Amino acid sequence: MNFIVYPALDIRNGAVVRLQQGDYARQTRYDDQVLPRAQAFADSGATWMHLVDLDAAKAGGYTLAPLLRQITRATGLQVQTGGGVRSRDDVVRILDAGAARVVIGSLAVRQMACVIEWLQAFGPERITVALDTRQDAGGVWRLPVHGWTEVAEATLDVLAQQYAAAGLRHLLCTDIARDGMLSGPNMDVYTYLRALVPAVQLQVSGGARDVADVVAAKMAGCAGIVLGKALLEGRLALKEAVQHGSVADPGDPLPCGELTEPVCRYRSV
């Protein structure tokens, strides 16, 4: 597998921020140097990045299209991005702005039929379903939505299997309890998902702190890992993470989910 390291930037009010456990009241603001940070990702060997519109995740209406255009044109990075994607027009607009994949979160939980239609229309390489999860007292993996302010009735295992059956290729799963905490990813949930939906390319998100976490995600058979706070706070060197992620492993169980063809435009879809 060609394991992908996704350096991440979460944007709120034009600034790079991080939330702790998805709580908008527990925010750390870093700076407004989004484009220089993206260029630094590319200079460190990253080929992809993960870009999140936190304002839109809460209120709807993706707002980062101009910034996305700047990033893709200036850096050559392939970008998967989301936050507040509520309609087909949102998907088209984001793809036309240069995204390689559109990340769909809350809507993927609330309106599965709609998202499956987009998978068929735009192709499974253009859609990443993001299931942000939190384990309840009974051990069930629940799915908070709308900026993690509400909890859906559906559960992680059920939705993952339904999307896999519909042809989903890219699934990003965030354990909210680990997000922004630098406590290491909860590999139990990813191992569980790998066994449950083995044909899906699984991305690890939440808690990554060092190279060992990158290696653990790769060895678990995941397709990639999203790195946020550890990079922003200088605890992890992206170049080193990319190097460890790219080491060949003859036991890799799945082919690469990395995009190889040029990004298309979808006005005619």
Swiss-Prot record:
Q: Mind listing the GO biological process terms from this record?
A: L-histidine biosynthetic process; L-tryptophan biosynthetic process
Q: Does the keyword NADP apply?
A: no
Q: In which pathway does it act?
A: Amino-acid biosynthesis; L-histidine biosynthesis; L-histidine from 5-phospho-alpha-D-ribose 1-diphosphate: step 4/9
- Coiled-coil annotation reads none
Positions of disulphide bridges: none
Principal subcellular localisation of the protein: cytoplasm
Q: Which residues form the active site?
A: D10, D132
Q: Which GO cellular component terms are attached?
A: cytoplasm
Question: Which Enzyme Commission numbers does its entry carry?
Answer: 5.3.1.16
GO molecular function annotation: 1-(5-phosphoribosyl)-5-[(5-phosphoribosylamino)methylideneamino]imidazole-4-carboxamide isomerase activity
Q: List the catalysed reactions.
A: 1-(5-phospho-beta-D-ribosyl)-5-[(5-phospho-beta-D-ribosylamino)methylideneamino]imidazole-4-carboxamide = 5-[(5-phospho-1-deoxy-D-ribulos-1-ylimino)methylamino]-1-(5-phospho-beta-D-ribosyl)imidazole-4-carboxamide
Any idea which UniProt keywords this protein has?
A: Amino-acid biosynthesis, Cytoplasm, Histidine biosynthesis, Isomerase
- List where in the cell it is found: Cytoplasm
Q: Which Pfam families match?
A: His_biosynth (PF00977)
Family annotation (CDD domains): HisA
Name the family. Belongs to the HisA/HisF family.
NCBIfam families xref list: 1-(5-phosphoribosyl)-5-[(5-phosphoribosylamino)methylideneamino]imidazole-4-carboxamide isomerase
Q: Which PANTHER family match?
A: 1-(5-PHOSPHORIBOSYL)-5-[(5-PHOSPHORIBOSYLAMINO)METHYLIDENEAMINO] IMIDAZOLE-4-CARBOXAMIDE ISOMERASE
UniProt-recorded name of the protein: 1-(5-phosphoribosyl)-5-[(5-phosphoribosylamino)methylideneamino] imidazole-4-carboxamide isomerase
